[in-house]
């Protein structure tokens, strides 16, 4: 269950500092662990570990691919805005926006295409909606439809999760801190 995931995270950490170079930052891993534990605590009383691990890990995956997509967007914008680049498009913001929605810039870098309504920021902005579970499920379906390698692989049980009202939104807000 989730305890196994956390154990593997703990075992992957390197407790000894490097002898040369910059000291390794450990805060992000601790933050990640803290968020995982807080997520588990939010759900533990309402469902068993076998179910809540799918919700938590599914949201983490959704946030990860969305964050990766946004990072690639920033790279694309920097490239098409740079007069020194072979891909320079001039100063017209409309041309830049069009480039940001060109899926080739993402797929050539092995970044999953994430439709606008499925992006984490869009979901986070709707986290307090009573139907956030269904919105997440629809986002996962949209991602599967746009990325053939993911078809049928994403767990879409958010709309059917039996949680207290507002709990799924709290979970989205919590995962947003990672």
Regions inferred by a protein language model and the residue ranges of each:
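Non-catalytic, mostly N-terminal accessory regions of nucleic-acid modification and defense proteins
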Residues: 1-178
